[in-house]
Amino acid sequence: MAVYTDVAPAELEAFLSGYDIGTLTSFHGIAEGVENSNFLVQTTRGSYILTLYEKRVNRDDLPFFIGLMEHLAARGLSCPQPVAQRSGAVLSEIAGRPAAMVTFLPGVSVRRPTAEHCAELGRGLAQLHLAGADFAMRRANNLSVAGWRPLFVAADGQADDVAPGLADAIAAELATLEANWPQGLPAGVIHADLFPDNAFFLDEKLSGIIDFYFACTDFLAYDVAVCLNAWCFEPDGSYNVTKGRALLSGYEAVRPLSGAEKAALPRLARGAALRFLLTRLVDWLNVPEGALVRPKDPLEYLKKLRFHQAVDSAQDYGLAA
């Protein structure tokens, strides 16, 4: 989450008048994340999250995101539920941006996940995949393999300004993955951005999953690979196989991976690392002036990519033989 667009108190009060959720008592921007502008809104009825969809978000995708949250919540997954206005509309506009109000989930995100957190996360991810199996809408993953070269181009020759040799490293990996990306794996709704700041815990148990604005239709095992990258590396860049084993065991307790998915996991993990390396690189080079946002270090994902390049099989991630 982040804040790119400011909202004036009077604007927000007028916006809230279209909802049956009480009157405004306080609000503040949320700095975490990179994509949209988010505010924690307190009213006389409770707490809510207001999201303003920024220019990088395609308005045509918003019904997918909103519909998915409604679908998953209806199937028992703990995730934000869109709040309808009195008119029945879920999408509205404020400060010149499309906007939606969603329910606030209790719990806290963890900055240093334990193996127990990883096991909980694995189970929750598999439950999300099963709950989304009958979701009728589809959305292509525009940040999968076909979208990586345009991101590299968007870095506009500046990769080596971030680290010498980075451009060549990205170019080589991109060529390898474009030529060898897995095909025909089980697919469905994926979260695609399930980092620790998008999962909430209460008493060490997963209490909710948030921020579905990268969700799309893609290989389910790619979502697992994203989570291995996001949850199972230590601050020094080393892979924690105990956390990986916990995450994978938790996932497979709910939805066992197929043989093809297991075989593809190292390549999928490389792809996930390259995806976040590229998007972080572009964001690092293009932070809007005055935005309340913390750009994330792209080189963290270069280190992770180097690890994945040396992996022989899914067993190296902790997957049971």
UniProtKB/Swiss-Prot annotation:
Enzyme Commission code: 2.7.1.39
Disulfide bond positions: none
Catalytic activity: L-homoserine + ATP = O-phospho-L-homoserine + ADP + H(+)
Alphabetical keyword list: Amino-acid biosynthesis, ATP-binding, Kinase, Nucleotide-binding, Threonine biosynthesis, Transferase
Entry annotated with the keyword Transferase: yes
Keyword Phosphoprotein attached: no
Gene3D superfamilies linked to this entry: 3.90.1200.10, Phosphorylase Kinase, domain 1 (3.30.200.20)
Alphabetized InterPro entries for the sequence: Aminoglycoside_PTrfase, Homoserine_kinase_II, Kinase-like_dom_sf, Pseudomonas-type_ThrB
Pathway involvement of the protein, from the record: Amino-acid biosynthesis; L-threonine biosynthesis; L-threonine from L-aspartate: step 4/5
GO annotation (BP), single: threonine biosynthetic process
SUPFAM superfamilies in alphabetical order: Protein kinase-like (PK-like)
Record GO terms (molecular function): ATP binding; homoserine kinase activity
Protein family according to the UniProt entry: Belongs to the pseudomonas-type ThrB family.
HAMAP family: Homoser_kinase_2
Name of the protein described by the UniProt record: Homoserine kinase
